[in-house]
Amino acid sequence: MKTLLLSPVVVTIVCLDLGYTMTCCNQQSSQPKTTTNCAGNSCYKKTWSDHRGTIIERGCGCPQVKSGIKLECCHTNECNN
Protein backbone atom coordinates (compact mmCIF):
# COMPACT_ATOMS: atom_id res chain seq x y z
CA MET A 1 0.00 0.00 0.00
CA LYS A 2 2.85 2.42 0.79
CA THR A 3 4.29 1.79 -2.66
CA LEU A 4 1.04 2.85 -4.29
CA LEU A 5 0.93 6.03 -2.23
CA LEU A 6 4.52 6.99 -3.05
CA SER A 7 4.25 6.37 -6.80
CA PRO A 8 2.43 9.64 -7.64
CA VAL A 9 4.93 11.60 -5.55
CA VAL A 10 7.89 10.10 -7.42
CA VAL A 11 6.26 10.75 -10.80
CA THR A 12 5.55 14.36 -9.82
CA ILE A 13 9.15 14.99 -8.72
CA VAL A 14 10.59 13.43 -11.88
CA CYS A 15 8.29 15.45 -14.15
CA LEU A 16 8.92 18.80 -12.47
CA ASP A 17 12.09 20.71 -13.18
CA LEU A 18 12.94 21.46 -9.55
CA GLY A 19 16.30 23.01 -10.43
CA TYR A 20 15.15 25.64 -12.93
CA THR A 21 17.87 26.92 -15.20
CA MET A 22 17.87 29.68 -17.77
CA THR A 23 19.39 29.48 -21.19
CA CYS A 24 21.61 32.47 -21.98
CA CYS A 25 23.52 33.31 -25.14
CA ASN A 26 27.29 33.34 -24.63
CA GLN A 27 28.78 34.11 -28.04
CA GLN A 28 31.12 37.07 -28.32
CA SER A 29 30.53 40.03 -30.67
CA SER A 30 29.37 38.80 -34.09
CA GLN A 31 30.26 35.12 -33.61
CA PRO A 32 27.63 32.46 -34.42
CA LYS A 33 25.03 32.07 -31.68
CA THR A 34 25.91 29.72 -28.82
CA THR A 35 24.06 29.17 -25.55
CA THR A 36 24.71 27.86 -22.08
CA ASN A 37 22.49 26.78 -19.19
CA CYS A 38 22.72 29.07 -16.18
CA ALA A 39 21.79 28.39 -12.58
CA GLY A 40 20.64 31.96 -11.93
CA ASN A 41 17.67 33.89 -13.24
CA SER A 42 19.31 36.49 -15.48
CA CYS A 43 21.44 36.95 -18.58
CA TYR A 44 23.58 39.93 -19.57
CA LYS A 45 24.92 41.68 -22.65
CA LYS A 46 27.87 44.08 -22.25
CA THR A 47 28.78 46.43 -25.09
CA TRP A 48 31.78 48.74 -25.38
CA SER A 49 34.08 50.18 -28.03
CA ASP A 50 37.85 50.10 -28.29
CA HIS A 51 40.50 50.15 -31.04
CA ARG A 52 38.99 46.93 -32.48
CA GLY A 53 35.51 48.43 -32.81
CA THR A 54 32.36 47.50 -30.92
CA ILE A 55 32.81 44.54 -28.58
CA ILE A 56 29.86 42.53 -27.27
CA GLU A 57 30.10 40.03 -24.42
CA ARG A 58 27.17 37.84 -23.38
CA GLY A 59 26.71 35.47 -20.46
CA CYS A 60 24.92 34.46 -17.26
CA GLY A 61 24.07 36.74 -14.36
CA CYS A 62 24.15 40.53 -14.14
CA PRO A 63 27.71 41.69 -13.38
CA GLN A 64 28.97 45.05 -12.17
CA VAL A 65 30.63 47.06 -14.95
CA LYS A 66 32.97 50.02 -15.22
CA SER A 67 31.76 53.34 -16.57
CA GLY A 68 31.73 53.49 -20.36
CA ILE A 69 30.39 49.95 -20.68
CA LYS A 70 26.73 49.51 -21.60
CA LEU A 71 25.09 46.70 -19.61
CA GLU A 72 21.74 45.10 -20.38
CA CYS A 73 20.38 42.47 -17.98
CA CYS A 74 17.26 40.43 -18.73
CA HIS A 75 15.28 37.55 -17.28
CA THR A 76 13.98 35.29 -20.07
CA ASN A 77 15.64 32.49 -22.05
CA GLU A 78 18.09 33.75 -24.71
CA CYS A 79 17.02 37.35 -24.02
CA ASN A 80 20.61 38.61 -24.39
CA ASN A 81 21.02 37.74 -28.08
Swiss-Prot record:
Compartments where found: Secreted
**Residue stretches spanning the membrane:** none
Protein name per the record: Short neurotoxin 1
The answer to whether keyword Disulfide bond applies is yes
GO CC, sorted alphabetically, is: extracellular region
Is the Secreted keyword given for this protein?
yes
Residues making up the signal peptide according to the UniProt record: 1-21
Which InterPro entries does the annotation name?
Answer: Snake_3FTx, Snake_toxin-like_sf, Snake_toxin_con_site, Toxin_cobra-type
Spell out the molecular function terms from Gene Ontology.
acetylcholine receptor inhibitor activity; ion channel regulator activity; toxin activity
Instruction: Name its species.
Output: Hydrophis peronii (Spiny-headed seasnake)
- Going by the entry's taxonomy, the superkingdom of the source organism is recorded as Eukaryota
The tissues where this chain's protein is expressed are given as: Expressed by the venom gland.
Disulfide connectivity for this sequence is: C24-C43, C38-C60, C62-C73, C74-C79
Query: What function does this protein fulfil?
Result: Binds to muscle nicotinic acetylcholine receptor (nAChR) and inhibit acetylcholine from binding to the receptor, thereby impairing neuromuscular transmission.
> What family is reported?
Belongs to the three-finger toxin family. Short-chain subfamily. Type I alpha-neurotoxin sub-subfamily.
Which keywords does UniProt give here? Acetylcholine receptor inhibiting toxin, Disulfide bond, Ion channel impairing toxin, Neurotoxin, Postsynaptic neurotoxin, Secreted, Signal, Toxin
**Gene3D superfamilies, per database record:** CD59
CDD domains in UniProt:
TFP_snake_toxin
